[in-house]
Structure formats: structure tokens, C-alpha cells
Regions:
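Short, small-residue-biased leader/transition segments that mark boundaries at the very start
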Residues: 1, 5-12
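Solvent-exposed, non-transmembrane regions of membrane-associated and secreted proteins
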Residues: 10-195
Length: 195
């Protein structure tokens, strides 16, 4: 079976611990990151919640969980109840803090427009260009991503690769994964993470 795959990326990201601000005396003041998402409430509902994903202008605005495997949340909702739609989830092999070089998120393409249905719309270059900003909120930081390419693929293990021996291997992997993209954007800077 074929699926739509979107490859967003980051070129720079903030320190997970603090943001820096300049005060009136021009001294750097460290302030703690405060998430726009109440992760304490989400954690009390389900401790498997690791993030929240939002793509402005789309229906994608969901919590992200990570299970012990890639099967549990495929057909279970956030509360662990059976659900055709499942829950958006991070590959079990990725690091929960999104520090893997390639962070793989899964979600169903639901006919009612929910979950990752809007990913299939990225095949249109105009839609791709208008919805290229992707935000991942974690308890430690806010990650702003830019869409790199949309590819119609079959799910296979190569697309799940999360560890790389070198920067060259990672760059080669990016080229391989985005080859044949139906839509894409120019790369701005050096890619440090792929999602």
C-alpha cells in the first residue's frame, strides 16, 4: 500500500533548557521555556505523550505519543481505547525528546479529514508552499520545522532509519528519501534534523 510522506526539517533549534533574552542592561537573562501546551495535564491523562504537533491552516493539531512498539497506538486513542483513527505517534526507536537525526511520526489518513489526512494534500505545490510551517511542541522546547518534500511511498524500513554513522551518510539519506518528490522546497541552510 502507498502512503503520502512529508519530510519536514530543522536547520537550527533552541537549547532545550533555556531561551536567552537581553534585558535593559544588555545582560543576557536566562528564562525557562514555557510551553503553549499544558503537558502536565496531558501527562496525567497519558504518560506516553511526548509532544504536540500543529500545522497552521490544516486540521493537524494533535498530541503525539510514543509507545513501546509501533503497533499499540496504531488503533488506540489517547486514552488507550480501541479507535480506527488511532493516535499520532513517534516511532518507538526515536528518542522521546526529538533529538534523533530522523524523527518519524505516524498517523492515519482518515476520510473525515482528521489525523494526517491533510498530508495527502501536500502533493499540490501551492498547498505545500502555503502550509510549509510545522510546529512540534515538547515539554522542553518548541521546534519550528519547514516542509522539505512530499513523497508518495510504500512504508519500508529504510524510511525508519534514525541513526547515521556520519554527516555524509545523513546527507545521502536525505537525498535518497526525497528523490522523486511530487513537491518540494529549496533547502535553507544545513539540515540538522529530519522529521
Amino acid at each position: 500500500t502507498r502512503q503520502a510522506t512529508l519530510f519536514p526539517y530543522t536547520t537550527l533549534f533552541r537549547s532545550p533548557e533555556v531561551d536567552n533574552e537581553i534585558d535593559e542592561t544588555n545582560a543576557i537573562k536566562e528564562t525557562e521555556y514555557v510551553s503553549a501546551i499544558d503537558f502536565a495535564v496531558l501527562d496525567s491523562q497519558n504518560p506516553d505523550v511526548v509532544a504536540w504537533i500543529q500545522i497552521p491552516g490544516t486540521q493537524i493539531n494533535y498530541p503525539v505519543v510514543q509507545g513501546k512498539d509501533n503497533d499499540y497506538y496504531l488503533h488506540r486513542d489517547l486514552n488507550g481505547q480501541k479507535s480506527t483513527a488511532g493516535t499520532i505517534f513517534l516511532d518507538y526507536a526515536d528518542r522521546a525528546d526529538f533529538s534523533s537525526l530522523h524523527n518519524v511520526l505516524y498517523g492515519h489518513h482518515m476520510k473525515n479529514g482528521s489525523m494526517f489526512k491533510d498530508i495527502s494534500r501536500y502533493k499540490d505545490q501551492g498547498y505545500f508552499d502555503q502550509h510549509s510551517e510545522i510546529i512540534v511542541y515538547t515539554p522542553e522546547r518548541e521546534i519550528h520545522l519547514k516542509a522539505l518534500a512530499a513523497v508518495c511511498t510504500s512504508p519500508d524500513a529504510i524510511r525508519r532509519k534514525t541513526e547515521f554513522a556520519s554527516g555524509e551518510e545523513f546527507a545521502s539519506y536525505i537525498q535518497q528519501m526525497t528523490a522523486g518528490a511530487s513537491t518540494s522546497a529549496p533547502i535553507e541552510g544545513t539540515i540538522v534534523r529530519l522529521y
